[in-house]
Amino acid sequence: MIRTFATIANRGPGIRLATLAASRNLGYSSGGRISSVRIEKLRFSPFRSSTSLRYTSDIQHVMQEADSLDVNNSVSNTGVLDYDRKNAVVLYFDHIYPFSVSRYSWKQYFTLLFPVNRCSEDDIRERVMNLSSTEKEPLPKDVRILELVPMRRDGGVFVKFQLPATMSARELVGLICQNTKENEQAYGERFLVGPLNKIWNHFPRCFQVKGTPWIEDLRRFPSVKLSVKFEGERLTEEELYVLFRRYGLIIDIAPGSGTEPAVIHFRKIRSAICAKNCVTGITLNSGNTVVHIQYLPLKRVNYITDFIGNHQRIAIPIILALLATAAVFIFDPIREWFIMQNVSHRHALDSYKDNKFLKLVSLPYEQVRRWIDSGYDYFDSKFGCDEEDEFGGEKGEAPNDLWSERYEKVKQLKLWIYENINTFIIVRGPKGSGKEELVLEHTLRDDPILGNKLLYIDCEALVKSRSDNALIEATAQQLGYFPVFTWTNSISQFVDLGVQGLTGQKSGLSESKETQLKNMFGLTSSAIRKLALQDYAKYKKSVLRQRRRQQGDSTSEDILSEDEYLSQHPERKPVIVIDKFAGRADGDQDFIFKMISEWSAQLVQSNLAHVIILTHDVGSMSHLTSALPNQVMKSISLSDASQRSARHYVLNQLNKESQAQVNELDSCLEPLGGRMLDLQAFVRRMRSGEAPGDALEEMVSQASEQITTFFLSASSTQNSWSTAQVWLLIKLLAKQESISYETLCHDPLFKSPDSLSILSTLEKHDLISLISDKGVLNTVSTGRPLYKAAFRSLVEDPKIFRIYEEDLYNKLIALENAKIAKLEDEFAKLASVDARLVRNRLDYVSNKIVASTDKITDYEEKISGLSSKKSSWF
């Protein structure tokens, strides 16, 4: 047996490692190492006066030299706690204050809310004395606290006790530490205090300060690891364990080598704090070793970021999916709520007009506004400067006479809504015919029930959006979709490119505008459904309550399903008004019409809403029929006002001086027809002082200029129509009220397959109007009544007539020449075949060539016959 002894003598005040013995039979492993070690008992020697010679270390000498002339040598200035070790002892109490593990630790600020943690110095003194004393073992009366040095960052306090004459330092320290433990045991026996003491506010502990503590307030926050530096000889791992184990459980000790510091890893941060404050500055090994201790910041490993960095192809899609899920769960309920408010107008100011508190503010405001308006009206009546309101009439006066003849259509529209049978209604009419006012003002908003749930969508505002972000913002504004983050589109595109470069696949974060709009309309459908079924829960409760009252009655009412409930209560369903719906649009936003038609058809098929579509375009029916192929759509057609209503409207808008020209008005109103926009423009011109004839002539001249600039411009190559086609329509409509589509198709200019699309485009621009019969195009008429006079003005102008008539004949000649060229090619091919076999075909081709040649000759004669004289077209 071999026994190895290691003795460390005089290793500082109160520490002596007596014997370290390891014994083992003479048996070595294959590696030549000792198999096991037995640690014998460690004995601690009492304090010796010789060990205190270097107790103060060199820091105190530096302090004395630097502060030899300084008056204030307190701990806060020097960082050194100086005391007479013969007459005083220093102890460290932990958990007096909440300690901070970082600069942004929330606990240090949260605990300040409680009065127990906002203690003054007197409170701390009293608390320390209570901890140090018990009823069985009270402190001697001559023991008092000489100085109290708080360490708020570490959560503890250094307490300097006066040493009584009847006790030694060892006895006083043992008494205080024992009393503190007994108080902790008594405190933990209280109800619910023990578990809470372990979780939240630990009971303070007491340790003797063995070294020279460095009282510093640097940004070095406590951690479970301590860095131990040695000045002089190093300590072994066993010696470090003996020195630090009393403060708490140690997980690991790294003794280091050379100049590297040793690292001690405690299980709890509380133990590390006590060890650092009590041991730092201690002198061991007869003054040959001085220990300096600092907190070692933990290098925390973030496994999440490590996983993301090492597994990008897996982590990035997961992160994006989580972000998308979080966005859906957070923002979609908010957006749905805003959509519901936009449809129901529940929080609009109009809904609070009967509130008594609001009336206290609104009634004085309304009275002052009436006084101001009456003053304006007085001056307007005196100086004749009455203005038109948004309807074209005088302020305070609406043109109800124009709507008297449409009263039956308003009744029919309301009847269809309350019938609740496939409420997909189409209101047609030319621009300026008052479709919006008929539906919104006279049908819905005047109704106290239907006007409560109304969603208005202007397709023109969506189609005219110049960018994708503008389209999304416009759609969100009309739907009430809030919040919307359009700036994320640009960021998502960059992120998508970056992810594709890193992982080789797209992240799917960026979405097309079509997908985003579908999501917005889908969320709107969900909000509309909630609004429609808002009172369904109350209905079920009322039926169940009635059943309980009528128990045993076989005639009790059955609970209707959601679809049956909405079928029997059409007033519960919101009304969706889609304005300015068209078949197609110029630009990249053309898809919006098809998307809205499919969305509205889904609402009608799901029995969630009434849909009313306002359109002036016949081509829009293609989207609607494809969205609802098996349903008959209800339609209301609006035309211009009658001549009598138009005359009555103009007379009501004119002042007394202008009414003297009533006889001249009748002849001027006939070319204007009943188009509201033209009537309002005519009234404005007469109010400005123009005579009726001059106003009409100027309006016709502007319309003619608009036609020649936009429709008859030869420089425009983007138009689908030709100048000759438009001029032919102008000539025919200037002479007739309407043209038969069958007759028009016989003209060479309209024999091409795209003639119908050209006519639809011209109708969209309000030049002509297409009238269908049983879904088939029947006649073509003028788009605006004013255009009829403009057509006649253009045809009657000799110069304009000669220019466009010659262009028309040249176009016809070009068509015939192209036809002859094809026939000549065919004739050349037939020449190589036996004439007896293709004699009939040769005769047919030759006759066609002769007929086309005769037409060309006739067209050329007409061109030569054109003169600058007045046109004889009429």
Curated annotation (Swiss-Prot):
| Keywords of the record | Membrane, Mitochondrion, Mitochondrion inner membrane, mRNA processing, RNA-binding, Transit peptide, Transmembrane, Transmembrane helix
Query: In terms of one coarse class, where is the protein primarily found?
Result: mitochondrion
> Biological process (GO) annotations?
mitochondrial genome maintenance; mRNA processing
Q: How does it sit in the membrane?
A: Single-pass membrane protein
Q: Where is the transit peptide?
A: 1-55
The annotated region (Disordered) lies at 547-566
Name a Pfam family for this protein: RNA12
Segments on the Mitochondrial intermembrane side according to the record's topology features: 335-874
Report the SUPFAM superfamilies cross-referenced here.
Answer: P-loop containing nucleoside triphosphate hydrolases, RNA-binding domain, RBD
- In terms of superkingdom, the source organism counts as Eukaryota
Q: Which family does it belong to?
A: Belongs to the YME2 family.
Q: What does this protein do?
A: Plays a role in maintaining the mitochondrial genome and in controlling the mtDNA escape. Involved in the regulation of mtDNA nucleotide structure and number. May have a dispensable role in early maturation of pre-rRNA.
Q: What is this protein called?
A: Mitochondrial escape protein 2
